[in-house]
Amino acid sequence: MNIIDDGKSEEVVEVDPPKPITPKSDNSTSQSNNPQESNKMRAQIARVTQRSKQEVPHYYLSTEINMDKALEIRSQINSKLENQNIKISINDLIIKAAVETLKKYPIFNSRYENNSVITNDEINISIAIALDDGLILPAIIGCNNKDIKDISNSTKDLVERTKNGKLTSAEYTKGTFSISNLGMFDVNNFLAIILPPQTSMLAVGSVKKTPVVGVDDSISVSNIMHASLSADHRVTDGAAGALFIAELKNNLENPVNLII
């Protein structure tokens, strides 16, 4: 029931109750109930995600990351790179932090195929990019050999070519670890579905000013970001995942590790 107040009168008027509506006797179907065929991209997403949830035993670990130092060092880097037309984003720092973490814990940079775990030599970070027809996760190839500037340039180039339909076969198929960032949509936290045959995926939310209690019980305000790791339980256990996400947290809270 909708109630509309026009603000013009406080008079109460008695009205007859509405008569019941008799359903039409024809066999027409409401338009809202008509099935809609999925487009090709939506259908592919459905197949991949359904397969992942049915076949991959996911486990999830989440943490809060203080991004104060990361934001500070990002500002410093961008000031120095201003004349080079390079601007480092928060997502660039997250990608670089994930790469350094994967170097220390390479089991999360593996794939699961034919009941075997294969650790990939190269770190190719797949990033979730939203398009009009759905979602795609192309890969930045060779992140293990890229510094923060290279990652920034590669990411911008990849996003542009994704939107123009100019990806290479390797960028479509050779990802080894995925990152989905919904921070730009004001999402705090979420859990991602692993993209097989990859065995891990990182989900990050927005950076928000949040009250933080210090070791001396003092309260301050910091820039906090939630991050969640989705991992394949056939490949790793919770303890290994905890070490991974703790290292990722350390890399972002001490970002000097990302630029030296």
Model-derived regions: residue spans:
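C-terminal catalytic/motor cores of large multi-domain enzyme assemblies
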Residues: 2, 7-260
